[in-house]
Regions:
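Alpha-helical membrane-embedding segments
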Residues: 76-92, 99, 125-139, 167-184, ...
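Membrane-interface segments at loop-to-transmembrane junctions
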Residues: 7-24, 52-70, 95-115, 134-146, ...
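Alpha-helical transmembrane segments and adjacent TM-loop junctions that form the membrane-embedded core
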Residues: 148-154
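Transmembrane alpha-helix detector for multi-pass membrane proteins
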Residues: 24, 28-43, 56-131, 154-161, ...
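Interhelical loop segments of eukaryotic multi-pass membrane proteins
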Residues: 48-49
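Short basic (Lys/Arg) and small-residue
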Residues: 1-12, 159-244, 248-249, 257-265, ...
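Polybasic, low-complexity association/targeting segments
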Residues: 1-41
């Protein structure tokens, strides 16, 4: 039986800035070949192009094409300059790890590609426009098409300018990252990826059973970006085995480290190759199945904003707001356990669980530590704790309580009396909500 083909779980982003422009440039060459067909047929009087579709004499056509090529080339250089300037600003304001969000932007790629394709198309039109008496030729349909491409290119330039102006704003960037976190969880834990469901296993029992299995060593060093759990479940089911992955997406794995255990060991000869096929590594983390990475990105923006060199309290507050939204999305998506079952409810694939309390700690710790002299951010964190507590699990509420206590200690250490009163009031509101929920449980 053929091994199941892994799903395409590549990161939903293309950080190759050249791929789309290259495709559109090749498309422009193909389009030129298509539009030349009626022009050649008209030249040999096989068909007749109406006079209202013509664009004047050969001299007029060459002059128009030459001027248009120069304008398109100038704008293309301007687009590249703006793109490089934006990348420089992003690296400074948000951090170099967020550069890929601008490199992946489809609007930038398509705008560059459209201008490159238009430039190539006009250049080809210019080459075939002959003024020799023996080979006079004006590709009228191609000339009209070139003008359509020019209009489309400049329309895309207007939208590109709008896109750049909005995308470099802090609130827009933070909101987009937060909204990407929930799809990452869905891709990682969606029950549509498995065929059945069983009772949650005891992690210690699973690891004890894995100790009796065969070890699959990691073939390369790098971040575990994603794995195809559906294909692994199918392969393990066919061999009546279980695959225990020792790492979850987002963790760094060293070459030669135990990546997975296969139980029973007799199935290792078949399943080892399947594990290699279905687990992807890379030089960086992605949001494909790594919800922690999205939270870490927002935290990085907040820490940069709260640094003494920037001191942007409003961005720090916005980061706290959107982190609360991200935690809410994670809390409302229950299957955070890394367990995948076959149709009979037999556990086939296990990975370390993503605990919500760990995500709470990740979302609050570093921002709290960077906000010891920024009471507004600490107050907003306490407000977020109060609003989240009713919708969190008991374990996550304990983590929220720990965060509230830590924030109060920060306030006692560094805030002035007036700010300390505001912080104490926010803390009491959060504690009252947590106490009420604990009493009702």
């Amino acid at each position: 039986m053929l091994a199941p083909r892994p799903l395409d779980l590549r990161a939903p982003r293309d950080i190759n800035l050249w791929r789309t422009p290259l495709a559109l440039s090749l498309g422009a060459i193909v389009l030129f070949g298509v539009t030349m067909i009626p022009d050649v047929l008209d030249k040999y009087a096989i068909i007749h192009i109406p006079s209202w579709l013509t664009m004047g004499s050969i001299d007029d056509a060459r002059a128009i094409l030459s001027a248009t090529m120069g304008a398109v080339a100038t704008v293309l250089a301007l687009i590249f300059s703006v793109a490089l300037l934006v990348l420089s600003m992003v690296a400074t304001l948000f951090g170099p790890r967020l550069l890929y969000r601008f490199m992946q932007d489809r609007v930038t790629q398509r705008t560059v590609g459209l201008f490159m394709g238009t430039f190539i198309y006009i250049g080809l039109c210019f080459l075939v426009t002959h003024e020799d008496p023996e080979s006079r030729f004006v590709p009228q349909i191609s000339l009209i098409t070139s003008w359509i491409l020019v209009i489309a290119s400049f329309a895309s330039l207007v939208y590109y300018s709008h896109r750049i102006a909005t995308s470099i704003q802090n609130p827009d960037m933070i909101a987009r990252i937060a909204r990407d976190i929930y799809p990452a969880v869905v891709r990682s834990h969606a029950r549509t990826s498995v065929e059945g469901e069983g009772a949650l296993p005891d992690d210690a029992a699973v690891l004890a059973r894995a100790a009796t299995g065969a070890i699959v060593a990691c073939p390369t060093s790098g971040y575990l970006q994603h794995f195809d759990h559906a294909a692994l479940v199918a392969a393990a089911r066919d061999q009546s085995a279980m695959i225990v992955l020792r790492f979850r997406p987002g963790q760094f794995v060293l070459r030669g480290e135990p990546l997975a255990s296969i139980v029973p060991a007799s199935a290792a000869s078949v399943l080892e190759k399947q594990v290699d096929r279905c687990v992807a590594f890379g030089d960086h983390r992605t949001l494909v199945q790594d919800s922690e990475f999205g939270i870490a990105q927002i935290v990085e923006i907040a820490i940069r904003a709260l640094s003494p060199a920037v001191n942007d309290t409003f961005t720090g507050v916005a980061c706290v707001d959107w982190l609360a939204d991200a935690l809410l999305a994670l809390a409302e998506n229950p299957p955070l356990e890394g367990n995948w079952y076959d149709a009979s409810g037999v556990l086939r694939v296990w990975t370390p669980a993503v605990r919500l309390e760990r995500l709470v700690k990740l979302a609050f710790d570093q921002i709290r530590q960077a906000s010891t002299t920024t009471p507004a951010v600490l107050i907003r964190q306490l407000d977020a704790i109060r609003r989240l507590s009713a919708r969190m699990s008991p374990a996550a509420r304990m983590a929220l309580r720990d965060q509230a206590e830590a924030i109060r200690e920060c306030a006692a250490a560094g805030a002035v009396a007036l700010d300390r009163r505001d912080l104490d009031a926010a803390f009491e509101r959060a504690r009252a909500e947590l106490d009420a929920l604990a009493a009702a449980a």
